[in-house]
């Protein structure tokens, strides 16, 4: 029983471990590599039956503590359901999630990080420790170059440079060098950061030559700035055919018959070593010649030719450049070749003396019918104009520095002549019009041998109803010429005859004479109606624009072109045969933007809160490329498209707008267009409520003010009756009342008129003296007698501003003139007043 207890405990622990592991599945690289100061990217995925991950801890070199039943070790990172606790170094990042991604990043990584990384995962029902090996070196470890099993010259191969490192936070590059020099071929670099592998790979494709054999290829690891980190080198083993060169004795490879020649085949390079040797002459293998040296004893002229050596190895045969061996000998019996035989009378004939010799013959002797031809010592005899007496047998003898040859059989010269006095005759009556049927015949005087055929030129799909007769159906236009030839062994051509076909004008086109560049509005423009040819030459011209007749001259001139002159132009040219029209030519006039206007959608009155679109419409060629918008203060708006969209539109947007359009020719601007934004019912309701309340408050205050004013006036009136009255003066100023402007454009301008000035109206009222008391005043007449020195008058004046604006043609913006009224009131007492003339004085003072 005591022995059974530990075994049962072990079985239970194994079962628990197995059941726990069955709930977790991880995928990641087994080992990751890096170096001091770099970073490590750990791609990782996991799968857990219980997806509710509660905590994640990253240990460095974890060890299981049996006493605490937990893992001990340096905690690089810890994440719980309550939140993340960053590491002290803040260099470890958990890039995964609580579902299936457990990717990690350590940046920077240090040498002491080498060892095991433990990923401790805990859920509600299970726990797991996943281990990952990390190898961090003190210095960047070198990449590894992978070569194909075999490299042959001129065959494309792929060199692979592999580095077991890749990290998003630490960029690197792999550089290829050949003998320390960067290779010109472009390499393809790829990286892998997957759960299967982490690496950086560079692949280089190039075609090595035999000269690359034994050269050093380097793959250099560099950082992002190109700084050297590490490298790997390999020596190329390029398999190639033997490379050969022939050395000849004598060096110029020129010998006389009976002398000896030695040729040596030198192998400059071969990989692998060569196995067989052979010699070739003029491409044919020489028997029993399988050494690097070829000896030719007592050579003959037949041994002259091109020699090369061929050496083979396991890759294939290598062949040297050819060496031409010249064996010199005296001329052999000569033969004569007659060029251009049989010869035509009047033509040139050339005789060639052919004799095999090395070196070539330097002197020749010619014979005609067995008689030596004096002065003929060249290889060729040229007779510029052959005559019948030149016929006969020709032979020759050749001579070089080694001796004189023998005269061989001669060559016979046969002198013949082509048909004589050949002519082409037109059978039709003249003149010939385009489309007519024309018949021609070919005649000649004599021929040796007899004429067997006729030729015509130019060639065409024409009929030959009989030998020497040509019929042309539907003859074409132009000054066509026809010539015929009567042929036996050779052809004699007649002089060409012109058909002189009459036709309507051809190739009519419109050509712009000026300006040579683009046509701008206002330019002087000339159009020329051109045609290539016409027969007869007397022609007339007609110009049309869009189907409308313009003129009858060859040139159409515009002193100052306008956009309205643009259109499709064509011209007509006619003669007595017919007329021809040109293709339509489009006259395009470039002009700056014009007729600009601002259109408003849905209209120039918009309720606030809605959208308003202002469109800058224009007429321009080329089309407007840039738009600028301005408000009523001529301030440019930050909008440069054709449409200005206000959404939502506000009351503050009310005002005048204008736009400016620009193209490559110039610019133009529109007049002002006013946009009115009125309040929405909601805003009006709010403002009416506020206004009504304000008016009610003002009304109450006004009523109170009127009552106080009346009480004050009553008090002042009583005081005035008690006091000795005297003249009172006061001014009353009428305030301006603004009125809406008339329907004048916002852009209207006026001119100031200094003569239209303000005025002062002045009036004095004088009253006659009277002692007649008014009804009810008898009892108080004495008391109210005025002082003798008082002048009973009322003075009234008005400072009057005329109803006009500051400018003559601008209507003022107010409905009434602003005036200052001045009055002086004299209180009259009761009693006698001195006699005075009743009058009214009125004065206007202008200032």
Swiss-Prot record:
It comes from the Eukaryota. It is found in: Cell membrane. A motif (ITIM motif 3) lies at residues 820-825. It is a single-pass type I membrane protein. One of its GO terms (biological process) is regulation of endocytosis. Disulfide bonds join 161-219, 265-309, 353-396, 442-484, 529-571, 616-659. It holds the Pfam family Ig_CD22. PROSITE patterns: IG_LIKE (PS50835). Residues 20-138 form the Ig-like V-type domain. Residues 143-235, 242-326, 331-416, 419-500, 505-582, 593-676 form the Ig-like C2-type domain. The chain crosses the membrane at residues 688-708. A motif (ITIM motif 4) lies at residues 840-845. N-acetylneuraminate binds at residue 120. Residues 1-19 form the signal peptide. CDD domains: IgC1_CD22_d2, IgC2_CD22_d3, IgV_CD22_d1. PANTHER family: B-CELL RECEPTOR CD22. Predominantly monomer of isoform CD22-beta. Also found as heterodimer of isoform CD22-beta and a shorter isoform. Interacts with PTPN6/SHP-1, LYN, SYK, PIK3R1/PIK3R2 and PLCG1 upon phosphorylation. Interacts with GRB2, INPP5D and SHC1 upon phosphorylation. May form a complex with INPP5D/SHIP, GRB2 and SHC1. This is B-cell receptor CD22.
